[in-house]
Amino acid sequence: MNTDFPCADRKVIVALDFDDRRAAEELVERLGDACGFYKIGLELLTAAGPGLARDLVERGHEVFLDLKLFEIPNSVAGAVRAAGALGASMVTVHGMGGTGIMSAAVEAAREFPRLRVLALTVVTSMTAGDLADIGIEADTEEQVLRLARLAVGAGCDGVIASPREAGVLRELLGPDRLIVTPGVTLGPDVPAGGAAGGSAGGSVGGPAGGPVGGSAGGHARAGTPQAAFAAGASHVVVGRSIARAADPVAALRRARAAGNSCG
């Protein structure tokens, strides 16, 4: 297991949640040397192909491929090896796929010492009601912890969960494993060229540092970088709060300051 923690300027991962490569590259250009870590999800990967990820790595950036792999173990292993060959630093596998899928991902990643396998616990858009719809009686926190335990047993480097579960996960996982939290907003005071908050909207003060007012951006369990880092997150993923800010570099610095203040 790779237990290296990020340097301060790479605790904040900027989500390239775009549907074409040109828009993603425009944000990368605006951020310049200020950003060292980007997330590429299924939308951009499908629209732009793997070339952007490779190019970002070649420029010295780290890349988080958020693939949420949930397939037969052989297919998951193949996808993880492909992510490693691109030079990715992180790749996600669905914890709900069980130990077999996660173990296959971990084994495949051994060929790539820099690649960290993270288990997605419960997607940040899901609530207890959504879990009940698929026959899971546990609430979201219980399910997150259950899947985190499975991830530890499978040898994953860390987990993906909302900011609201970062504290209980740090208690469970100890100091070494990574806890990466999407669903993060900088709050309404970010100067925005459009709707701020995409990853989540609002400011400190809601439950577990969640948003007070504003759009949740599709995340039912959102939070701020301050709350996430204070609770024990190793990284936060920030999307539209940076991408749609009038000054993306200033917005990124605000998010990074939250990580620096938490050590």
What are these regions (language model features)?
Residues M1-R21, E25-L27, A166-L172, P191, ...:
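N-terminal amphipathic alpha-helix/helix-capping segment at the start of soluble metabolic enzymes
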Residues P6-R10, E71, S75-G158, S162-G167, ...:
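Conserved anion-binding
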Residues I13, G36-K39, F64, S89-T92, ...:
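Conserved beta-strand positions in the central sheet of alpha/beta enzyme cores
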Residues V14, Y38, K68, V91, ...:
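Conserved, mostly hydrophobic/aromatic
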Residues L16-V63, P73-A79, R149, P163:
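Conserved alpha/beta-domain cores
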Residues R30-L31, L56, A83, A151, ...:
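Generic structural signal for hydrophobic
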Residues D33, R59, L86, F112, ...:
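Structural motif
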Residues M102-A108, F229-A231, I242-G263:
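C-terminal helical cap(s) of enzyme catalytic domains, especially alpha/beta-barrels
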